[in-house]
């Protein structure tokens, strides 16, 4: 892996319905096999379902869910003298957002509702209320970091 140049971030256009960059990133993560229109209908369908169920602003609820799932600290492996330590490190804001999006989508795919729209809306509502698999994943990550706090002086 070359260390000479830093990879430039690609420009992402905001989504057409809400004008939100994060929703576009979320849509791109939901997308499978390049089928953007399918991903768009899933995400917009889930946000419409949230609006119907919660009777509140779906974009605000979406951002609340992302904030509740985003980890603040995680563990990274570090080899020191033949032993591998799990060292707790702070999570950069871009990675925090990417992990939150990934965990929400994986948790939604693991649910047992019939359609992806129902699964995604259910997981987003659960995450906004600090419940669900994605929030549990964040809590497990934080618990791991807390358990390995003794190795925090190995931070790099």
Curated annotation (Swiss-Prot):
Gene Ontology MF terms in the entry: rRNA binding; structural constituent of ribosome; tRNA binding
Gene3D superfamilies according to UniProt: Ribosomal protein S7 domain (1.10.455.10)
Domain of life: Bacteria
GO biological process, one term: translation
Keyword tRNA-binding: yes
Annotated keywords: Ribonucleoprotein, Ribosomal protein, RNA-binding, rRNA-binding, tRNA-binding
Keyword Lipoprotein included in the entry's annotation: no
GO cellular component labels: small ribosomal subunit
InterPro entries (UniProt xref): Ribosomal_uS7, Ribosomal_uS7_bac/org-type, Ribosomal_uS7_CS, Ribosomal_uS7_dom, Ribosomal_uS7_dom_sf
UniProt family annotation: Belongs to the universal ribosomal protein uS7 family.
Subunit annotation: Part of the 30S ribosomal subunit. Contacts proteins S9 and S11.
Function: One of the primary rRNA binding proteins, it binds directly to 16S rRNA where it nucleates assembly of the head domain of the 30S subunit. Is located at the subunit interface close to the decoding center, probably blocks exit of the E-site tRNA.
NCBIfam families, per database record: rpsG_bact
Protein name from the UniProt record: Small ribosomal subunit protein uS7
């Amino acid at each position: 892996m070359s260390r000479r140049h830093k990879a430039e971030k690609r420009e992402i256009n905001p989504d057409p319905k809400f004008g939100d960059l994060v929703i576009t990133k979320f849509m791109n993560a939901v997308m499978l096999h390049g089928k953007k229109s399918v991903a768009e209908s899933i995400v917009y369908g889930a946000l419409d379902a949230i609006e119907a169920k919660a009777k509140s602003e779906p974009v605000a609820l979406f951002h609340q869910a992302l904030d509740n799932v985003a980890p603040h600290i995680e563990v990274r492996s570090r080899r020191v003298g033949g032993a591998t330590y799990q060292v707790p490190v702070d999570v950069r804001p871009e990675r925090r957002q990417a992990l939150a999006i990934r965990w929400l989508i994986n948790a939604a795919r693991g649910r047992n509702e019939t359609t992806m729209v129902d699964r995604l809306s259910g997981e987003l509502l659960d995450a906004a209320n600090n419940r669900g698999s994605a929030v549990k994943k964040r809590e497990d990550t934080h618990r791991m970091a807390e358990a390995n706090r003794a190795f925090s002086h190995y931070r790099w």
